[in-house]
Amino acid sequence: MGLVVLAADKGAPGVTTAAVALAAVWPRPVLLAECDQAGGDLVYRLPAEGGGMLNPARGVLSLAATARRGLRADQVWEHTQRLVGGLDVLVGLTNAEQAQGLTWLWSPLGRAFAGLPGADVVADCGRLGAGSAVTDLLREASTILLFTRPTLEHVAHLRERIGSLAAELGGHAAPPIGIVVVADPREYRASITEVGRIISHAKLPATVLGGFALDPKGAEMLSGRGAWQAQWGGRLDRSLLIRSARQIAGGLAARATSGPGADRDAQGVASGPQPR
């Protein structure tokens, strides 16, 4: 189906929290994938189904061993785990040292995500850098979402990142780049409008899609420290974080079947199992 990539420039403001929130409210079956080259956080943030700890060895690391012999999209499901609350996840690498030996993986993994049977993929790619190997995964996306704070330094870094990323991706078939502003609820609309004005004035190939509320209490509940399973449908479901995630998710899900990777199956894809 479709691949939606979440990333940021310097500081990666709330990308993992946003990825979990978006996946949790996604209107179709979805897989949350940790693709941060610096290492993932889900193992430390959220409990597995049944209340135990997620297995850090089952995920991108175990999938890499499979991919050395060729990777079919349906094989991704063999390396996923399920969070308490029912969300399927592909746990990321544990540190940057592991990523250094797996730079070849991102291209076949991106193709597999784009052709994944039965679900969209929300991929947390963390902080992007110039010449990053994970750019090969981004090429397969339906949409790339870049998160920013509405401060001078964050928006300045964002402008530079959009320009360099567009140059790296190149071509008319490059995925569209959307911007999400992580903003204080008290200045929410004004912050989104101002970032949109700056991006438009700079004539950058990106569009501000909306905002994510800066909601520390909602983020704490979503992290597992606030008993996620017990509070889902209650305070967490009504939090500013989840409400803003729903606004973004609806529009993104419609885009997720129309991007560059959505029309291209991974080589050798076989009809595989539906999400568990």
Positions of the model-derived regions?
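Beta-strand-loop-alpha "switch" segments that mediate conformational coupling across diverse proteins
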Residues: A183-Q231
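Well-ordered beta-strand positions
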Residues: T143, G178, V208-G210
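Cytosolic-facing regulatory segments adjacent to core modules
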Residues: H79, V89-G126, A130
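Conserved C-terminal guanine-recognition region of P-loop GTPase G domains, centered on the G4
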Residues: L158-G171
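Conserved beta-strand segments of the P-loop GTPase G domain that flank and frequently precede/overlap
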Residues: V5-A7, A33-E34, V91-L93, V122-C125, ...
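Walker A/P-loop NTP-binding active-site region of P-loop NTPases
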Residues: L3-L71, D120, D124-C125
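Inter-motif core of Ras-like GTPase G domains
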Residues: L116-P117, G131-L152
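C-terminal boundary of histidine-terminating zinc-finger modules
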Residues: E220-A249
